[in-house]
Curated annotation (Swiss-Prot):
Residues where ATP binds: 306-313
Biased composition annotated in UniProt, kind: Basic residues: 758-767
Region (Disordered): 1-51, 742-767
Catalytic function, reaction form: Couples ATP hydrolysis with the unwinding of duplex DNA by translocating in the 3'-5' direction; ATP + H2O = ADP + phosphate + H(+)
Localization (cell): Nucleus
Gene from which this protein is expressed: XPB1
PROSITE patterns (alphabetical): HELICASE_ATP_BIND_1, HELICASE_CTER
Record's keyword terms, sorted: ATP-binding, DNA damage, DNA repair, DNA-binding, Helicase, Hydrolase, Isomerase, Nucleotide-binding, Nucleus, Transcription, Transcription regulation
Organism (species): Arabidopsis thaliana
Record text on subunit structure and interactions: Component of the 7-subunit TFIIH core complex composed of XPB, XPD, TFB1/GTF2H1, GTF2H2/P44, TFB4/GTF2H3, TFB2/GTF2H4 and TFB5/GTF2H5, which is active in NER. The core complex associates with the 3-subunit CDK-activating kinase (CAK) module composed of CYCH1/cyclin H1, CDKD and MAT1/At4g30820 to form the 10-subunit holoenzyme (holo-TFIIH) active in transcription.
Name of the protein: General transcription and DNA repair factor IIH helicase/translocase subunit XPB1
Induction statement: Higher transcription in light than in dark.
Length: 767
């Protein structure tokens, strides 16, 4: 779904349902080798190249913009006059793999086709338009794959009625097939009020007209049909909704659930008096993303992917204003909560008493029957003991039927802790917003059943050319290690301090200081310096006398520093730890200097770039090739000949796939900088080295925030060696006694287990 799972296309197309005979008819990639070409694969049968000589070009192929290959890959020429229409179509049916300036690569997957049908595209429409745009005749295998992936979509719906979940279908035989699965059968409640002959509750619902081929490219909404259809349904346990949706995906039972909210005909939940203000004018790509979400008078659950700074907030507020029901908005931190509350008031007519914030510092409630609650994932997912006031608010959240669940930075939802919010809160429609649909722990595909399919994804370079986001110059600055630092870096006993050594490299410090001076004094820019390593963050900020924000910084102090950075001419540089990666809106910043990072995280690299992507200046100056070719700068400082070089290359992959290129700079600071910069003399460098080596291992590590397996996926398990000296406080640690709570005062310790009752595998340990 995101770059985390799509990365590069599979060599063979993968299919979903096991019992669909169409799946078995699709040929293997064997047909696309030249039998005479012995070099087409290596000794293990791995494919090296393919023979596409069997593809027949159409006579007017020069006027058609794309190539369709039998393995599911599609290549689009961006210089074609039909590029815009072809892009809008491809982004609806396929996953983007790589989108450089001249040629895009896409990949058809079961999930991408599931998303296509969910926004109203019929199977025959997809095949017909692909054939019209393709330079060659569509391969038979691709046609069969499209049929197989879309055959069952729309046959099953997940419906929320009066805080109860029902699986609904006009086909009772489909429900029987679902109930033959153990997971779904266990999740069923058997308390339906009215049963048909098959044991399902029977009701009636309005049908709807399907889209024709002529309605595809002009985005026409589908008209609702008047006839009624008989539907069959059964109720499922709300706690099992996630598991049931997962079992219905294309890679399992292949009956993807349709989640639509007929909000205009919802007379049960109270309406929210909320409209967009006249000055809220969504841009063309924002309108397009909303048109994918709303169709046929209904709201679809799913994900919208827009670059940082491209106006995701306006999309979210517009969706809430269109549904006009109670909305629960989830953000990643308290600063982001304040910003979202501000965005709702900025773009909509919502009154102050209709919107409230729920954080550790602010526990508000809206007045009336409907309103907007803005809170964090942590506040909702927290499983520990709460204050009485917080418990009441959470209970209200659980008992309310939310019209819209709006999730910012939705890529964090697959984390074990955050995905709880999906089961805790009940909502008719879920909208996820993100700039980076990518994770390193391969959980990004979980969003298909946690939230829904990807509805729309914008192309970064198109928005740059349109002047909607900043035109960024990306550069990788190579900083040679000093010989003293490199000697310590190579020692085996310093394995835990390797990162601190290459981050505190004096040449890197000097390059950072030079860039700050250049952009502050000669260009008057606003600069953000990112460092994941807290030891380095503190040393850099203290030495250069700049404000810093990290995990332990209070909310009040964060707000004060950010406000000074935005408004004061005296505060032009701020140091941020990883807390600044997500959901902090700093539109004034136009320079980023990254001195340390979280291993090879592609998502973090893109999120940090996004801090400076908001458009700057007048529109005519923002257009690519306007007054300034580049109006924002992203520097990644890397110590050469260290592990950081490998991580840097891996981190850049997502941005390269979006069409960005990295310039390599090897001569910073310039030779004439001399003693004007810090750590010029060897004595200063040795003093810094001593400070790094004398710091405890716990002080030179990465900042630890809320647990997310995406970050853990980049780390290896480590074994630490201790000594009795740490107990005396020689490394900043002290010995403390405490009661864990398991044995209260006056209670006796539990007797050890009888050795004869131990399992055979463990008996020998107690001999």
């Amino acid at each position: 779904m995101g770059n985390g799972e799509r990365g590069r296309p599979n060599k063979k197309m993968k299919y979903g349902g096991k019992d669909d005979q169409k799946m078995k008819n699709i040929q293997n990639a064997e047909d696309y080798y030249d039998d005479a070409d012995e070099d087409s694969r290596d000794g293990e049968g791995e494919e090296k190249k393919r023979d596409f000589t069997k593809l027949e070009l159409k006579p007017d192929h020069g006027n058609r913009p794309l190539w369709a290959c039998a393995d599911g890959r599609i290549f689009l020429e961006t210089f074609s006059p039909l590029y815009k229409q072809a892009y809008d179509f491809l982004i609806a049916i396929a996953e983007p793999v790589c989108r450089p300036e001249s040629m895009h690569e896409y990949n058809l997957t079961p999930h991408s086709l599931y998303a296509a049908v969910s926004v109203g595209l019929e199977t025959e429409t997809i095949i017909s338009v692909l054939n019209k745009l393709s330079k060659t005749k569509l391969p038979k295998e691709m046609i069969e794959f499209i049929h197989a992936s879309t055959a069952n979509y729309g046959k099953v719906k997940l419906v929320l009625k009066k805080n109860r979940y029902f699986i609904e279908s006009p086909f009772p035989e489909v429900l029987k097939r679902l109930l033959s699965d153990d997971v779904i059968n266990r999740a069923r409640f058997s308390s339906e009020p009215y049963y048909g002959g098959d044991g399902f509750s029977v009701g009636r619902t309005c049908g709807e007209l399907e889209a024709g081929p002529g309605e595809l490219l002009n985005e026409a909404e589908f008209a609702a049909a008047a006839e009624e259809k008989e539907t069959h349904s059964f109720e499922i346990d709300p706690a099992q909704v996630e598991n049931v949706k997962q079992r219905c995906l294309p890679n399992a039972l292949n009956y993807p659930m349709l989640e639509e909210y007929d909000f205009r005909n919802d007379n049960v939940n109270p309406d929210l008096d909320m409209e967009l203000k006249p000055h809220a004018q969504p841009r063309p790509y924002q309108e397009k993303s909303l048109s994918k979400m709303f169709g046929n008078g209904r709201a679809r659950s799913g994900i919208i992917v827009l670059p940082c700074g491209a106006g995701k907030s306006l999309v979210g507020v517009s969706a809430a204003a269109r549904i006009k029901k109670s909305c629960l908005c989830l953000a990643t931190n308290a600063v982001s909560v304040d910003q979202w509350a501000f965005q709702f008031k900025l773009w909509s007519t919502i009154r102050d008493d209709q919107i409230c914030r729920f954080t550790s510092d602010s526990k508000e409630r809206f007045r009336g029957n409907a309103g907007v609650v803005v809170t964090t994932y942590n506040m909702v997912a927290f499983g520990g003991k709460r204050s009485e006031e917080s418990e009441k608010i959470i209970e209200e959240m659980r008992n309310r039927e939310w019209g819209l669940l709006l999730m910012d930075e939705v890529h964090v939802v697959p984390a074990h802790m955050f995905r709880k919010v999906i089961s805790i809160t009940k909502s008719h429609c879920k909208l996820g917003l993100t700039a980076t649909l990518v994770r390193e722990d391969e959980r990004i595909t979980d969003l298909n059943f946690l939230i829904g399919p990807k509805l729309y994804e914008a192309n970064w370079l198109d928005l740059v050319k349109g002047g909607f986001i900043a035109n960024v110059q990306c550069a990788e600055v190579w900083c040679p290690m000093t010989k003293e630092f490199f000697a310590e870096y190579l020692k085996k006993e310093n394995s835990k301090k390797k990162q601190a050594l290459y981050v505190m490299n004096p040449n890197k410090f000097r390059a950072c200081e030079f860039l700050i001076r250049f952009h502050e004094q000669q260009r008057g820019d606003k600069i953000i310096v990112f460092a994941d390593n807290l030891f380095a963050l503190t040393e850099y900020a203290m030495k250069l006398r700049k404000p810093m924000i990290y995990g332990a910084t209070s909310h009040i102090e964060r707000t004060k520093i950010l406000e000074a950075f935005k408004t004061s001419k005296d505060v032009n540089t701020v140091f941020l730890s990883k807390v600044g990666d997500n959901s902090i809106d700093i539109p004034e910043a136009n320079v980023i200097i990254q001195i340390s990072s979280h291993a090879g995280s592609r998502r973090q690299e893109a999120q940090r770039l996004g801090r400076i992507l908001r458009a700057k200046g007048k529109l005519e100056d923002r257009m690519a090739g306007g007054k300034e070719e580049y109006n924002a700068f992203f520097y990644s400082l890397v110590s050469t000949d260290t592990q950081e070089m490998y991580y840097s290359t891996k981190r850049q992959q997502f941005l390269i796939d979006q069409g960005y290129s990295f310039k390599v700079i090897t001569s910073l600071p310039p030779p004439d900088a001399g003693s004007s910069l810090s750590y010029h003399s060897q004595e200063e460098q040795l003093s810094l080295l001593g400070k790094v080596m004398n710091a405890g291992d716990d002080l030179v590590g990465l900042e630890q925030l809320e647990e997310d397996t995406d970050g853990m996926a980049l780390q290896k398990a480590r074994r630490s060696m201790g000594s009795m000296s740490v107990m005396s406080g020689s490394k900043g640690m002290v010995y403390m006694e405490y009661n864990s709570g398991r044995h209260k005062s006056g209670q006796q310790f539990k007797k050890p287990k009888d050795p004869t009752k131990r399992h055979n595998l463990f008996k020998k340990r107690y001999v």
